[in-house]
Amino acid sequence: MPAIRLPDGSVRQFENPVSVHDVAASIGAGLARAALAGRVDGALVDTSFVIDHDVDLAIVTDKDADGLGILRHSTAHLLACAVKELFPEAQVTIGPEIENGFYYDFSYKRPFTPEDLVAIEKKMAELAKKDIPVERYELPRDEAIAYFKSIGEAYKAEIIESIPQGEVLSLYREGNFTDLCRGPHVPSTGKLKVFKLMKVAGAYWRGDSKNEMLQRIYGTAWAKKEDLEAYLHMLEEAEKRDHRKLGRQLDLFHIQDEAPGMVFWHPKGWTLWQQVEQYMRRVLIANDYQEVRTPQIVDRSLWEKSGHWAMYQDLMFTTESEKRDYAVKPMNCPCHIQIFNQGLKSYRDLPLRMAEFGSCHRNEPSGSLHGIMRVRNFVQDDAHIFCTEAQMQPETAAFIDLLQAVYQDFGFDNILIKLSTRPEKRVGADELWDQAEAALAAALAAKGLAYELQPGEGAFYGPKIEFSLKDCLGRVWQCGTLQLDFNLPVRLGAEYVSEDNAKKHPVMLHRAILGSLERFIGILIEHHAGAMPLWLAPVQMAVLNITEAQAEYATEVAETLKKQGFRVDLDLRNEKISYKIREHSLQKLPYQIIVGDKEKAGALVAVRARTGEDLGQIPLSQFIERLKSELLH
């Protein structure tokens, strides 16, 4: 006689074992119709799951985040079902839920076309309308292998062959289609009403470039039509803001095949870069960081000592000279410890904050490269804080203050935080992990910051905090990190003399605020749609003459502004003023200064702001004061 406790604290008693669906129906017919799954003692299960003992139960609907995930995963299965009906020779592989949607990988004799996607989506809608039951059943491992081989699904059989002997596997059947899956899934296809197929891309089987190239169909699924429409609108906006397109339009940078994943910065783009880097340099100096510079190429022996050679070699660019193996550094931390190790350090020297705008190289797969957001050569605003165990919490708190101030200056107020704690495989005593996790949590609590706890997601050498930005389109970008490390200082022999005259290893805090400068600049470009704030704009204003008669005065105006430290373009071309204004507007300049005969005669300037505001004719000195005031804010 199971007693079932619901989220509101009420308890329902049942005479016999009962399914999740039956419990929902006992509460109300509306909830029974809305139920997509259940959460039994914290575990997600199908609505058909039978409860035969006392449990805590929550009914999952499309209003829950879990419910949306189940909708998307189930829509991936619906996609596979539709593909198999239309293209029986296609073989199915994997089809997970992803952020904002799902995908499914197929092996097929020819590429899927845009017309195929239209037909597949239409078939999915037909199958959804039929409200086909989705049924879960189990098979022993070897029977499951035999079943998938018998229907020609070699990839599914291969997946199961990698599962240990003796396992019982769950399968889901909807109509004529059966898939291997842990679930849970919606009770029937009729729950899947709001979806759209987005694109086809290539993907290697098991993510290995040595394997066959499969076809990955991406889609999106939502609970309500309005949610889908809002998402598609966001994608339209994101396309307009695509940093790759704006990078070309605004003449900021380019990437070419001869240097994949590496950026050619143009003068305007490099000016933007310099504004970001110089700002961060001022911030570092104000917060007692010491800037250093370390080598690009380091002997293999150091990477072996640090553990990177064993754990990270596939992502490292290597070379050989004079019978010695070298690696181009993928990160800066081992080199910073080499500087720390020069000379005896005392506890009085700690905390020691060491920063570097370090150029790193990682051999990322070519398929993962994306503009300047995902590159092979990047610069981090990297720093390492060497401190005592007692200093972990105050250093964490100081870093959080610094990070929040920096993000605010760049126009980001919405910060999401995750705290990742000890994984199963780790180094260091549990007491040290207790202290480290408590230090990070206490620093966040002291600031009144909400965070998502991610148990077991820390690195093997220490817990970490991740900071993500939410941009104007609601997209989330992970940028900042704070990572405690008990391991690397020990491996590389970093020591200091403690207050009791004993040699101890410092705790090392790996920290970054922007992360990769390339990626952060890409985020800035998309967040601002290329219309950078005055302080960041590569060109802050253009001075335009109407006719040749004002050329000399326009030059004087431009020179005066340059002497005040502003970044100015002077446009004396013999073109119509309307043409020049339009051209500079497309470059998204904060201001345009137009000088004609009236302005010249009155020693004035006519100013147009990017916002559409017309400042009228004003003395140049008054405009300069406005600019200085704007830069202060």
Swiss-Prot record:
Cellular localization per UniProt: Cytoplasm
Source organism superkingdom: Bacteria
Cofactor(s) needed by this chain: Zn(2+)
Entry binding sites for Zn(2+): C333, H384, H510
Substrates-to-products reaction catalysed: tRNA(Thr) + L-threonine + ATP = L-threonyl-tRNA(Thr) + AMP + diphosphate + H(+)
GO biological-process terms attached to the record: threonyl-tRNA aminoacylation
EC top class, as a word: ligase
InterPro entries: aa-tRNA-synt_IIb, aa-tRNA-synth_II, aa-tRNA-synth_II/BPL/LPL, Anticodon-bd, Anticodon-bd_dom_sf, Beta-grasp_dom_sf, TGS, TGS-like
SUPFAM superfamilies per record: Class II aaRS ABD-related (SSF52954), Class II aaRS and biotin synthetases (SSF55681), TGS-like (SSF81271), ThrRS/AlaRS common domain (SSF55186)
Family: Belongs to the class-II aminoacyl-tRNA synthetase family.
Described function: Catalyzes the attachment of threonine to tRNA(Thr) in a two-step reaction: L-threonine is first activated by ATP to form Thr-AMP and then transferred to the acceptor end of tRNA(Thr). Also edits incorrectly charged L-seryl-tRNA(Thr).
Assembly notes: Homodimer.
Protein's recorded name: Threonine--tRNA ligase
